[in-house]
Design a protein with these regions (language model features):
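Residues immediately flanking
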Residues: 13, 26-27, 127, 139, ...
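Conserved pre-motif C helix in the palm subdomain of viral-like polymerases
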Residues: 69-85, 140, 178-190
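C-terminal reverse transcriptase regions that engage the nucleic-acid substrate
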Residues: 3-121, 224
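Structured nucleic-acid-interacting core domains from mobile-element enzymes and related host factors
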Residues: 114-137
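Beta-strand-rich binding-surface signature
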Residues: 10, 21, 52, 85, ...
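RNase H-like nuclease module associated with reverse transcription
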Residues: 9, 132, 150, 168-257
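RNase H-like nuclease fold core
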Residues: 76, 136-177
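Amphipathic alpha-helical interaction motifs in eukaryotic regulatory proteins
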Residues: 31-35, 56, 73, 77, ...
């Protein structure tokens, strides 16, 4: 066995070892994507999706090459491993991968324009971080204008370092904002990719969360909207809010102190 020193590259992930922590990014891969889709010279934008954007199956627009669109969306998927800031936007456009139109392509290309201006961004893991596990979860209500299903987002931190994140449309309808929040809280509490979403009764979710609290497995706390880190995973935000939450989830420039 040969000692080749500290890891600097692994499966497309660039790892920068620093005195105060580790910085992980995909700068080279991002440049490859921009070059592949002729976006190296595009004008950059401040957010991956414009605030208020909603896509629908009834959107107008000319049909575009489905192979090109699938390739573009597929290329973005791998980036979400180190770029949680594009996860929500990626989730929205990937929902329409089988029905690409010029309207949807425009929204997808905006993600590339955002990446152009943030090529050197990545995740920073501080060496001085504690080991307290903290999770944030949130949900919109009936946010999908086609089927009125809700979007759930959560993010987990170990100390100040983000370790897990998710942005998913729930496969069931929720009948109130309260129920949508219970679904989000249950999903976050379990943080389980095989969570059985077909258990529809709200009482089941309530009792599950209550049992976890009683056993002191979790501590549930109210979080003000301004401090809700999971908001970046459930809706397109204005730049000021997006920038603040992007920083909150540990994203920074490579040489930023």
């Amino acid at each position: 066995m040969t000692d080749v020193g500290l890891m600097s590259y692994y499966l497309g992930l660039e790892v920068k070892q620093m005195e105060d922590g580790i910085f992980i990014s995909q700068e080279s891969y991002t440049k490859e994507i921009l070059k592949k889709f002729n976006m190296l010279d595009c004008n950059s934008v401040n957010t991956p999706m414009e605030s208020g954007t909603k896509l629908s199956k009834f959107d107008e627009g000319e049909k575009v090459d489905p192979i090109f669109f699938k390739s573009l969306v597929g290329s973005l998927r791998y980036l979400t491993y180190t770029r949680p800031d594009i996860l929500f936007a990626f989730g929205v456009v990937s929902h329409f991968v089988e029905a690409p139109t010029s309207t949807r392509l425009k929204v997808t290309r905006r993600i590339l324009c955002y990446l152009k201006g943030t090529i050197d961004f990545g995740l920073f893991y501080s060496s001085s971080s504690d080991f307290n596990l903290v999770g944030f979860c949130d949900s919109d209500y009936a946010g999908d204008i086609d089927d009125r299903k809700s979007k759930t987002g959560f993010v987990f931190f170990l100390g100040d370092s983000v370790i897990s994140w998710s942005s998913k449309k729930r496969p069931i309808l929720t009948l109130s904002t309260c129920e949508a929040e219970y679904v989000a809280a249950t999903s976050c509490t379990r943080e389980d990719p095989v969570y059985h979403n077909r258990s529809k009764h709200i009482d089941t979710r309530y009792r599950f969360i209550k049992e976890c609290i009683t056993k002191k497995e979790v501590e549930l706390k109210y979080v003000k909207s301004h401090d809700q880190a999971a908001d970046i995973f459930i809706k397109p935000l204005k730049f000021e809010d997006f920038q603040r939450l992007r920083s909150r989830i540990g994203m920074k420039k490579k040489n930023q102190n």
